Structures are given as C-alpha cells and as structure tokens.
C-alpha cells in the first residue's frame, strides 16, 4: 500500500494536532471522515501487508528463474539468476519492501529486454505477474 502505514499515521497525527476545529465544523467533519478512511485502509494493510509482499517477491523470483535461461545478455542473465535464488530473510515490512523494490527494478529491466528483443512469451509472463500483483494490492473500503 502506498503510502505506507507509518506515513498515514503521521499524517493523521498532524491533522489531529493541527487544530482542525479552528476551521469550522464542516471542515472538521471532512477531516474526520478522511482520517477514518485512512485508518480503515491502514487496518486492512496491517492485516495483509506481509502476505502480499512475500507473495509478490516469490512470484517475481519464480518469474526470473523461468526467464533467465532465455536471456542472451550475460549481465542481465546473471542478475536474474541471483535474484531468483534469493529469499526474504525477514517479515519486517521495511525489509520486504526493500527486497520488493529491488526485484521490481530488475523486473523493469527484464521487461525492457523482452520488449527490445521481441520476446513476446516473456512479455506475457511478465504482464501476468504484474496483473496478479495489482490484484493483490487492490484495496476495497467495504468488509
């Protein structure tokens, strides 16, 4: 989820400490609605945040393992193989995010390579992983 929960909580504290009642009841009511929505999103993220990141990282690594044998660029192939062999050492969100960001940067590199080299099957596999990632991160406000 972006922004991350610490950012949402800090913003909430700023809103509450900033004297929202000074601007009138309508403004305060709007701010409280916004804060309530942010807290609901934070609760949902808290519940599923680690699971989403672990699944994404696993899917990306599996994709790299599948793509690497077809890559002719030696440097990219080595990066894909190294990333595919990696694993998440911690379930801390900050550590999972760091791994996820690094994997996503390499995924972008792999996608550019696939597009530049007409590797349509690789492109389709990449898009399937991206679609699954987007579906996992979808946030619904209802129950």
Regions found by a protein language model. Name each.
Residues 93-143:
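Amphipathic alpha-helical binding modules
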Residues 6-62:
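N-terminal interaction modules that seed assembly of large macromolecular complexes
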Residues 15, 19, 45, 66-70, ...:
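Surface-exposed polar/charged interaction patches
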Residues 29, 33, 37, 56-63, ...:
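Short, surface-exposed, charged/polar-biased interaction segments
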Residues 42-89:
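Aromatic-anchored, charged helix-turn/loop surface patch used as a conserved interaction hotspot
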Residues 9, 53-56, 69, 85, ...:
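Intrinsic-disorder-associated interaction segments
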Residues 1-3:
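Histone-fold modules and their flanking histone-like tails across chromatin and transcription assemblies
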């Amino acid at each position: 989820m972006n922004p991350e929960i610490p950012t949402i909580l800090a913003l909430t504290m700023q809103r509450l400490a900033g004297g929202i009642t000074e601007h009138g009841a309508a403004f305060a009511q709007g701010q409280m609605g916004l804060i309530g929505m942010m807290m609901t999103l934070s609760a949902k993220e808290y519940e599923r945040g680690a699971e989403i990141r672990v699944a994404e990282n696993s899917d990306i690594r599996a994709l790299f393992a599948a793509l690497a044998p077809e890559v002719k660029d030696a440097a990219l192939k080595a990066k894909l193989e190294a990333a595919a062999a990696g694993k998440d050492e911690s379930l801390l969100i900050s550590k999972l995010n760091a791994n996820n960001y690094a994997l996503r940067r390499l995924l972008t590199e792999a996608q550019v390579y696939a597009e530049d080299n007409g590797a349509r099957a690789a492109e389709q596999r990449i898009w399937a992983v991206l679609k699954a990632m987007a579906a996992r991160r979808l946030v619904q406000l209802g129950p």
